[in-house]
Amino acid sequence: MTKGILGKKVGMTQVFTDNGELVPVTVIDVTPNVVMQIKTVENDGYSAVQLGFDDKREVLSNKPEQGHAAKANTTPKRFIGEIRDAELGDIKVGDEVKADVFAEGETVDVTGTTKGHGYQGNIHKDNQSRGPMAHGSRYHRRPGSLGAIINRVFKGMKLPGRMGGKTVTMQHLQVVKVDLDNNVLLIKGNVPGANKSYVTIKNSVKANTKKSLSKQHNK
């Protein structure tokens, strides 16, 4: 079973541990999420909890969005996401999910959309090296050879194209601090996306896998 919360990336800062160690952290605003809908296997084919984050003015929302929010007795939301196979417990539509869903020291997976860089060449996009810059060279920043005697381009070739703007998950990040008063999570390291971009935080999958494997090994 999983648990999670939706949030907005604020920026990065640093904190000091009790040992005096400096730890870079990402500040994530996790204003209480509202449970918009509970999906079940019987009705929807899978189990999930739908959360809503960041209020949206009704004048900017359409009728279906307003009606969906009204069922949860809340306002329309800018960011709606699902937590699959969530720990339901006594949770019901309209309840709030707060920052204390996670504890300090827990590991989480954070999903966000990376910064978009537009159309870029191989040197910037794929970290390739440039050619000689002398007058006699005819190869400076172009892509290299695509292979010998082929009349097509193989899939996966590193060529110029759009860079960034992709959904990326950073795995196994540690929750350094849970600030319930300010509705903030401090997560060690960086998370994908620009400041003010939306992120989804779930408990770490690999952490659970490692624990289960260690238990099997000990048996």
Swiss-Prot record:
Gene3D superfamilies: 3.30.160.810, Translation factors (2.40.30.10). Residues 113-142 are annotated as: Disordered. One of its GO terms (cellular component) is cytosolic large ribosomal subunit. The keyword Glycoprotein does not apply. Belongs to the universal ribosomal protein uL3 family. Part of the 50S ribosomal subunit. Forms a cluster with proteins L14 and L19. This is Large ribosomal subunit protein uL3. The lineage of its organism: Bacteria, Bacillati, Bacillota, Bacilli, Lactobacillales.
